[in-house]
């Protein structure tokens, strides 16, 4: 009987020890899994206020000027690794395209919708500085849509392909929120809204500085 009791106690101690080890293993796995998930917050959503400053263009006896304005830019970025990310953005501004032609000056008030995508190169920086600089390049389209306040009849909505380049920096507020300052340059052909009388056949450039907030998840 004594031998059986000892054997039972040993077996009971063995199972208790195994149970403790199992619980400890599960807790350890849970901790490491949570840490891994926290480190793998690869998606970002950004909302930024922007400026929109377009260079004057000349061609075929026509001078074109776009009024300076402001708007917004929203984006989604997916971090592929510590070096590169892919992003897609939508932006909106409203300005007036002014044309100096032989018969005078005409203007078209325009909603400009921006659809772009690209690759982001993340420049390494010390973690203690909380600043994460980056460079970007890509392409997309600017869609120019005349409003009802346009002074020229017959102007149609027109899309222009655009090359995008730029850079910026994020300042980390926490694991999930950052402040962002960015510059984007847009290179594209000046719009003429399908009217040959307004065609400068010129390439123009828009500077788009911006600042906003980023949510990482």
Roles of regions detected by a PLM:
Residues 1-41:
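Cleavable N-terminal export/targeting peptides
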Residues 37-79, 86, 139, 143-146, ...:
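Short glycine/proline- and aromatic-enriched beta-strand/turn motifs that initiate or cap beta-hairpins
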């Amino acid at each position: 009987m004594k031998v059986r009791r000892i054997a039972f106690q040993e077996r009971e101690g063995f199972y208790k020890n195994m149970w403790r080890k199992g619980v400890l293993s599960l807790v350890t796995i849970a901790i490491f899994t949570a840490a891994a998930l926290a480190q793998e917050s690869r998606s970002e959503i950004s909302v930024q206020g922007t400026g929109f400053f377009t260079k004057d263009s000349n061609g075929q006896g026509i001078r074109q000027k776009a009024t300076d304005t402001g708007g917004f830019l929203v984006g989604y970025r997916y971090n592929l690794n510590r070096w590169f990310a892919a992003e897609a953005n939508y932006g909106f501004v409203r300005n007036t395209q002014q044309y100096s032609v032989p018969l005078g000056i005409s203007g078209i008030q325009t909603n400009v919708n921006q659809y772009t995508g690209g690759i982001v190169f993340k420049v390494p920086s010390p973690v203690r500085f909380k600043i994460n600089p980056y460079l970007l390049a890509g392409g997309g389209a600017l869609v120019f849509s005349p409003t009802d306040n346009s002074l020229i009849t017959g102007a149609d909505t027109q899309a222009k392909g655009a090359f995008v380049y730029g850079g910026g920096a994020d300042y980390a507020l926490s694991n999930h929120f950052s402040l962002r300052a960015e510059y984007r340059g847009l290179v594209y052909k000046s719009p003429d809204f399908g009217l040959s009388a307004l065609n400068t056949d010129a390439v123009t450039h828009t500077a788009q500085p911006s600042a906003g907030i980023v949510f990482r998840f």
